[in-house]
């Protein structure tokens, strides 16, 4: 076995081998028992924690969390190596070929089409519907709605003006209000309202994920200010007292540093 104890510094190949040792018979029972689905949530959590490092521009967090993401990639690849379906080298080969294919001018190919046309050709997508259907269903719903609308616009569905998108949001909200008041199932109307809000974001060229994250941060700050202003625990306050405390806090204070850079970019990586 490789001596992992005495090294002062480790490299990529050490990590690859360490994952193999942990998952091998006689290694760590927990690591050896994991499947793609059992650690799926771990993959997502590590990716979001890496994003937290980006948002804070903290190199220590980024270094640690990118390592955790890399560990997840190697772990899943090693599961497939054991299953005999593909290896880490296959993963590297696939992504290299993808990058070379998507940059024909740089790597000596003939004139290429646009970015979306290149991706459609690469993925074997023949229709605009194929392109929309290729958007991952596992994405957060707000993000998925944004991507669907952008791809539909790229296929020829003309983007709406700000006024038109706001009108559709008003219409969707009115349907939601009616469904709620009449005691029906508001699920569809609520979904349409959220989808319409994403259309407004597109018309404004704003990233809905960023906007909602910033709204969450403002909510936390306002709640903290309300709690600090209370003279007793919030649980001991009456509904009227809580309402007064909430309404006296300025929702725009303190001025929060945005969690995310503006991310409205038609040149996507997937």
Task: Tell where the protein language model's regions lie, with residue ranges.
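Flexible "arm" and connector segments at domain edges
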Residues: 1-65, 71-270
């Amino acid at each position: 076995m490789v001596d992992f104890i005495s090294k002062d510094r480790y490299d990529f190949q050490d990590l690859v081998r360490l994952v193999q040792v942990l998952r091998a018979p006689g290694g760590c029972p927990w690591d050896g028992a994991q499947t793609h689905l059992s650690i799926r949530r771990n993959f997502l959590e590590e990716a979001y924690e890496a994003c937290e490092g980006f948002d804070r521009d903290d190199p220590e967090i980024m270094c640690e969390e990118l390592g955790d993401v890399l560990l997840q990639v190697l772990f899943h690849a090693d599961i497939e190596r054991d299953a005999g379906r593909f290896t880490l080298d296959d993963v590297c080969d696939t992504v290299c070929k993808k990058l070379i294919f998507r940059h024909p001018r740089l790597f000596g190919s003939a004139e290429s089409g646009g970015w979306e046309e290149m991706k459609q050709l690469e993925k074997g997508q023949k229709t605009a519907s194929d392109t929309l259907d290729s958007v991952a269903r596992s994405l957060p719903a707000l993000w998925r709605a944004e991507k669907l609308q952008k791809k539909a616009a790229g296929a020829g569905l003309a983007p709406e003006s700000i006024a038109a998108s706001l009108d559709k949001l008003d219409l969707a909200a009115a349907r939601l209000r009616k469904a709620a008041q009449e005691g029906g199932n508001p699920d569809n109307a609520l979904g349409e309202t959220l989808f319409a809000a994403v259309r407004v974001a597109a018309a404004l060229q704003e990233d809905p994920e960023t906007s909602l994250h910033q709204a969450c941060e403002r909510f936390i700050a306002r709640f903290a200010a309300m709690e600090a202003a209370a003279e007793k625990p919030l649980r001991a306050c009456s509904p009227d007292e809580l309402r007064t405390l909430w309404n006296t806090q300025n929702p725009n204070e303190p001025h929060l540093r945005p969690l995310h850079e503006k991310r409205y970019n038609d040149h996507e990586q997937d």
